Swiss-Prot record:
GO terms (BP aspect): DNA-templated transcription termination; transcription antitermination
Protein name: Transcription termination/antitermination protein NusA
UniProt gene name: nusA
Residues covered by the KH domain: 243-291, 331-378
Coiled-coil residue windows: none
Family note: Belongs to the NusA family.
Upper classification of the organism: Bacteria, Pseudomonadati, Campylobacterota, Epsilonproteobacteria, Campylobacterales
């Protein structure tokens, strides 16, 4: 028993586990062995004294002649026999017997150590599982060890764990080879027969948020905060920031001097263009900022009950625009010459603005001043030549 106790500190150091956890595992294995190898009906207890573990069997003192002495002899002892061991003992008292591993069969000892090894490995896996659960949505870095025929990229992380970056979680246009170093966000921790499997992603908005936190110390220090993040991975992204410190410009902090911070993040994300905007809790202002670089004239917010939408509208509207059974809709007025900027190439700008703000955006265009002027001039035929000269002298 002393040898097992001495192992606790050694195992705790080697496996980087708390000594209390190791002790609990060993105690559980000892109790299991006693019930399997000695008597499954008996009551056992493991106690720790002077850094040594003792396996103890507990018996209750009963009056002589009690039927339970015959039915469950492993749980009870008669008063007369108990007094031979301790004259001061009384009925319903508990006596304890110390059991020795040396008195057990070698097969039982072997099974104990085999079970102990299994339980320790399980405890170690549980510890790692809990540790990685706390690191969800954080950036992990590793080295590519395999790219399979489905283009799933397997990554060695911290020299002992395996991560997988599936093709659908890779930025479009990216390719990796064995030996490459990769940064990716941890999205899920799975248990498999081979151990833990860490699922990674480079396309989730959390990847951009995590990189910003690493690159911008003001975010980690909670002086500025990321409010919303929307991405079309590898193409473009929009991030809104709020400053908790009046002296800090959130956009300047995020972008960095000469764009050094945001450019470093963009390079990590395969040259993804990142728009940084200041958050506003006024929806009209927020939507106006989100649609930059387009210049917006006005924004009208409407919250339409779902039951008022027709079948076609219900089918086309995305769930993220529905809040409390109301469609969040923004009617944006702008000059016609600004509409292409607001929509963006392939609709990217308006799509990201909608994702960022949570509003379904519709546009209403207004003819530009230049166009109005041209229309007015077309109504009058310009006078030229002699006719123009004559008009100068008319009263």
């Amino acid at each position: 028993m002393e040898k097992i106790s001495d192992l606790i500190e050694c195992i705790a150091y080697e496996k980087n586990l708390p000594k209390e956890m190791i002790s609990k595992v060993i105690q559980g294995c000892l109790l299991k062995m006693a019930q399997n190898e000695l008597d499954p009906l008996a009551r056992y207890l493991v106690v720790e004294e002077n850094k040594q573990l003792q396996l103890i069997q507990l018996v209750e003192v009963l009056e002589d002649g009690d039927e339970r002495l015959v039915n469950d002899p492993s749980k009870y002892i008669s008063l007369s026999k108990a007094k031979e061991m301790d004259p001061s003992v009384k009925i319903k008292d508990e006596l304890s017997y110390s059991l020795s591993l040396e008195s057990m069969k070698q097969g039982a000892i072997n099974r104990l150590f085999k079970d102990l090894q299994y339980q320790l490995e399980k405890a170690l896996e549980d510890s790692h599982f809990e540790a990685f659960q706390k690191r969800l949505n954080s950036v992990l870095m590793g080295q590519v060890i395999l790219v399979d025929h489905n283009q799933n990229t397997f990554i060695e992380i911290e020299q002992q764990f395996q991560g997988v970056l599936s093709m659908r979680h890779r930025i479009k246009g990216e390719s990796f080879k064995v030996g490459d170093s990769i940064k990716a966000v941890l999205t899920q921790v799975k248990r498999t027969k081979k151990g833990l499997l860490l699922e990674l992603s480079r396309t989730t908005p959390k990847m951009l948020e995590a990189l910003l936190e690493l690159e911008v110390p003001e975010i980690k220090d909670k002086e500025i905060e990321i409010i919303h993040c929307a991405r079309i991975p590898g193409n473009r992204a929009k991030v809104s920031f709020f400053s908790h410190n009046a002296r800090i410009d959130p956009i300047g902090a995020a972008v960095g001097v000469k764009g050094v911070r945001i450019n470093a993040i963009s390079n990590e994300l395969n040259k993804e263009n990142i728009d940084c905007i200041e958050y506003s809790n006024v929806p009209e202002i927020y939507i106006t900022l989100a649609l930059a670089p387009a210049k917006i004239l006005s924004v009208e917010i409407k919250k339409i009950p779902i039951e008022e939408l027709n079948a076609e509208e219900k089918e086309s509207i995305q769930e993220r625009f529905i809040v409390n059974n109301h469609l969040q809709k923004a009617k944006v007025r702008l000059l016609d010459i600004e509409k292409s900027k607001a929509i963006g190439k392939g609709g990217v700008n308006v799509c990201l603005a909608s994702m960022l703000t949570g509003y379904h955006i519709e546009f209403e265009t207004i003819p530009s001043v230049k166009e109005n002027a041209e229309n007015e001039s077309e109504k009058e035929t310009p006078k030229v030549g002699v006719e123009a000269l004559e008009s100068l002298f008319k009263n």
